[in-house]
């Protein structure tokens, strides 16, 4: 419609600045266009009446005009009420009914204390030549690096937080008793005050750093006189929707940004490559082929300058991604390196404490630091891979959905199960690599100011389990904590089921152990947890878990590479779990994804010492970019405008009751079993419109449904703490999940959940969009700050404990992003993610599996992901959301999409028919419309509503029975405005009429 287009073009600049997409704006206008036209018609009528009234007598003329104006205002007020309590109710009420959030001081204090504890146990000492802790004689420090004045406290997007009250690096050093060189600090703050923004729509990858000319002789002479010790801070981070560039030269020269036009038919919607960079000098900061995770030329110049003037140099790497750090060994003056990811509100206090020795570092790496990222097995199979032969399909989708990003991407998980340390340990054992040439710092690595001796004791094979103890003795001179890391090695047959040479199976963090003292940790390992998944049918037709016969090794290691103690046991014959399942399974695990997710790429295999490494991990061949007819046909079935939900309909399904008057309220179901008969009675009370609203209005909320007494509730981000941009409720800035994971402390993860959960309670917000537990498949993933580790077991246990902590407060966590959402590029552009089922289950579902099976709360939720698993969207994947999540793992609760931007494939009908219950949007897209009123479709809606209602009913919202009802803030506001407006209009109308009558009477008397 011409009017709709005009209004969209007129209002887009204003609403886009508020974060409202053009697609959403278009949808809102389409909903309201009838009302807008009515108001315009009324305006025209009013104007006509006023013009015609000119012919009336002078006094009566004014009465007519005033009456017309008053009538117009009154009718518009009625229409505004109808709009706000009709089509826009959930959008308006979510804002107006939001409560003013004031966190209790006790809550904030607890959060800040917990965050500092996380950093004290999570910062990793990567190198120490004896320089740390600093001598008590050192009172002053020269702090170099622009990042020292603008450190990274967390991430962006859903992983962002309010860092306005956060303690920075310089303040932490001062709090630790050091003075810092203010001349250096002033030079950096004068150079640039603000950090460049890395956002979803546009990224500024600039690394501000003064060129070497700024380090004048007088400045450096002053610095040397000030102190003989230098601290250098280097920072890096990505962002939501923004993977880190692998070729910074292309960002600098602009060719990177031009890729949007090459791969997208809607380049304005395609933001992944809209990056820019401003050089610090009259030269390029990066040379051709250098990545964002390498030092810039200006940073190298700064390090050259510092190391030429100081013999005592401490480097602080303030990064959320594992950088290339081989340059550390090129400077003999660098005596210590501390890895300090985004530290949240108070985490940097730990930095000063580690430097002065009041805290003994005990953090361990959660990723493998490699010397050359271009030599990693994933390097050629990530990022901007787009199909080249589907232009017609892309044009068709763009015509149907204005939110479509215009591209179709793919990613092959060609490295298979060999992610991170699992590749390097196995490749070293097979002789493919020389370990020391490739790995700078292993997974699970971290130094301490003391030394520990530990070994496996009392090892016993109990049949289904093995049990043992590990005694950790502090053999050094200061108290400290240590991490006990347990790995297993399974027997591998050449050409058989893929197996890594080292696999983390258990871990524990000790208490602080005094010198000469010890602590014992006891372990029970289930043998079934060492089973491999046979997706290729090597031993199990149809796929399944199998514990193969042979010798197994349980090893105690100080990191993934260094074995301290080991024990062995033997499995006499293969144990096939594809028939009866593992003890933790609700149903047997068999192949679910292999038919459509495996793809036809060469997968890395350990066979013959990784003989196919070059082919599997090389640049994809040209035909990989050509979508096959079979793949296209499968994709088209899931495309908005082509998708036909009636294919799911079953004529034998019976239409359930709707709109019944059973007298139940949602509060009556709190605490009742999921299968309780009263649930059907409650669901019978829902109308078709109730169900459509409850399903579609899930944007940072769940909708009010009066027919069952369900209140409107708030959900919000995120992994870094309370961050509700709708209600303006912001909590304490929690650190990145990388720093949390580096503690290797499950009890502390639980404490994080408890303290963060209390902030949600204070905000009356019990839905938490977190934690996130995707895998650090690559170092370049823009959202690694939001995920724990490259290892699925570490991720799963940390997540489970954090979730359980939050659940004690009545918070229902949305573990996300389910699943294989391991890169940002093309995430909403039909990102077809191909992997073997073994890879999917062992590498990428396992964290979610452990968190689900280990959850101890009453209410839990899941957020599905943007990407596709093979040719099926994750948000509408029956095998993922029903067969695996609910069937195998026993999950009970609701599943919500990631942000429902439509994107050409997020279709409500498709989602609810395949296990996704709630749309994270505002019922604003054409793809949200639920029009199929068949029994099958209504049953799917009913099931989705049950999952939503069950989750909310068992959360903190309903912990004390029926939540307080009565008049909402929105209703109070509207009643007040309506009453005031009515009184004003009546008074004005009365005055007009009285004055007219008075003048008329005077005229008669005259």
Explain the meaning of each model-derived region:
Residues 562-584:
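Short beta-strand elements
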Residues 1-537, 541, 545-555, 559-560, ...:
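Glycoside hydrolase catalytic-domain context in secreted enzymes
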